[in-house]
From Swiss-Prot:
It comes from Rhizobium leguminosarum. Keywords: Activator, ATP-binding, Cytoplasm, DNA-binding, Nucleotide-binding, Phosphoprotein, Transcription, Transcription regulation, Two-component regulatory system. Residues 145-374 form the Sigma-54 factor interaction domain. The modification 4-aspartylphosphate is found at residue 55. GO terms for biological process: phosphorelay signal transduction system; regulation of DNA-templated transcription. ATP binds at residues 173-180, 236-245. It holds the Pfam family Sigma54_activat. One of its GO terms (cellular component) is cytoplasm. Residues 6-120 form the Response regulatory domain. This is C4-dicarboxylate transport transcriptional regulatory protein DctD. InterPro entries: AAA+_ATPase, CheY-like_superfamily, Homeodomain-like_sf, HTH_Fis, P-loop_NTPase, Sig_transdc_resp-reg_receiver, Sigma_54_int, Sigma_54_int_dom_ATP-bd_1.
Length: 448
């Protein structure tokens, strides 16, 4: 059964209070009714999850004083005023001061219910976004899971339902869509939050190194093993292990990883000692591991072991209504970081936000917002410098090519492998073009 939406009702008229409470309860609300403002203020928490409906004319503390006090507690708390005909001018002023709505007595039940329903939805979104921002801050993550589109609502609901379980999770999504953010949130919202969150990009390490990184090794296990090393899996025991780009994991390592998932134990290199581990594994892939034609050498049994729960993150182009909200958040954060004011949006920036396909997804949008705040004209693709009069076609193509490379580097956080993949050119060609255009790829990475 769904949880009833809470509403606080304050009215000193016993009969009207009872009738109003009954109307709201029949409409599916959970009503906390009070006979005065003092009782309500003593009982209501600052983060009350629903709207407040109050009469204006009450002894001791009237509805307008109550509204002002509640605004001081939480400026986003929706307050609906019930008012007699003579109080309408005061109610209008309260609306201008931030009250959610006023309803003139006598009122139809539907009028009250619809107003409370809209206010409840607004309150739910406000509290939900606060929770997500806090989760992102706690995780020290630069790409929070922000959005109000239905697909993001559904994603958050899934995360809430599974976060506090120990089920292993497979996260699917394009580059820059926020897969590690999802993993961080699963960790922060779980009972493992006090344990370590350990991340490893399987595509960033050569086959000769990845086993030692994951499982650890004893001194002398191989040439160069001067001392004992604790692996990422053991370090994550008690917390969460995040394996990004798991589709890049070597076949031999996949076999060992399957045993970790099944037995929750490891055997470090150079020893026969079996060590138990207690961890949750969140794996991420940018390809469809469920498609045999796509997954290639990735083991089917490992896929099915990870596929207890699969979370798909939609690309930014499929939730375009979230772009203004995300851009606003990233611009505000960049302004604080760079000690700049958020500039007004120019027509070029508005056009770019509306028309760009965002192949780098949320990460690309974040970098674009930073460039806008820094005053780079237009912030990106819209900011290509005017071509000098009389520039030849080859000169224009050279400038355009350089801009595409810069944008792709930015969208991929300076990661060479992902940038080459996105551009579809050989590695040597890529480095030749960097040198020819004088582009320093190090300047495009947000990692310090």
């Amino acid at each position: 059964m769904d949880t009833l939406m809470p509403v606080a009702l304050i009215d000193d008229d016993k009969d009207l209070r009872r009738a109003t409470a009954q109307t709201l309860e029949l409409a599916g609300f959970s009503v906390s009714a009070y006979d005065g403002a003092k009782a309500a203020l003593a009982d209501l928490p600052a983060d009350f999850a629903g709207p407040v409906v109050t009469d204006i004319r009450m002894p001791e503390i009237d509805g307008l004083q109550l509204f002002a006090t509640l605004q001081g507690m939480d400026v986003d708390l929706p307050v609906i005023l019930m008012t007699g005909h003579g109080d309408i001018p005061m109610a209008v002023q309260a609306i201008q001061d931030g009250a959610y709505d006023f309803i003139a007595k006598p009122f139809a039940a539907d009028r009250l219910v619809q107003s409370v329903r809209r206010a409840s939805e607004k309150r739910r979104l406000v509290l939900e976004n606060r929770m997500l921002r806090k989760a992102a801050e706690d995780a020290q993550e630069n790409l929070p899971l922000i959005g109000q589109t239905p697909v993001m609502e559904n994603l958050r609901n899934i995360l809430r339902h599974i976060a506090d379980t120990d089920v292993d999770v497979l996260v699917a999504g394009e580059t820059g869509s926020g897969k590690e953010v999802v993993a961080q949130i699963l960790h922060q919202w779980s009972h493992r939050r006090k344990g370590n969150f350990v991340a490893l990009n399987c595509g960033a390490l050569p086959e000769t190194v990845i086993e030692s990184e994951l499982f650890g090794h004893e001194r002398g296990a191989f040439t160069g093993a001067q001392k004992r090393r604790t692996g990422r899996i053991e370090h994550a025991s008690g917390g969460t292990l995040f394996l990004d780009e798991i589709e890049s994991m070597p076949a031999a390592t996949q076999v060992k990883m399957l045993r970790v998932l099944e037995m929750r134990e490891i055997t470090p290199l150079g020893t026969n000692e079996v060590r138990p581990v207690n961890l949750r594994v969140v794996a991420a892939a940018k390809i469809d591991l469920g498609d045999p034609a796509v997954r290639g050498d990735f083991r089917e049994d490992l896929y099915y072991r990870l596929n207890v729960v699969t979370i798909s993150i939609p690309p930014l182009r499929e939730r375009r209504d979230d772009i203004p909200l995300l851009f606003s958040h990233f611009a505000a954060r960049a302004a604080e970081r760079f000690r700049r004011d958020v500039p007004p949006l120019s027509p070029d920036v508005r056009r770019h936000l509306a028309s760009h396909t965002w192949p780098g997804n949320v990460r690309e949008l974040s970098h674009y917002a930073e460039r806008v705040v820094l005053g780079v004209e237009g912030g990106g693709a819209a900011a290509v410098p005017p071509q000098p009069t009389g520039a030849t076609l080859p000169e224009r193509l050279e400038r355009y090519e350089a801009e595409i490379i810069r944008d792709t580097l930015s969208a991929n956080d300076g990661d060479v492998r992902r940038t080459i993949e996105a551009l579809g050119i050989p590695r040597k060609t890529f480095y030749d073009k960097l040198q020819r255009h004088g582009i320093n790829r190090g300047g495009y990475s947000s990692r310090k």
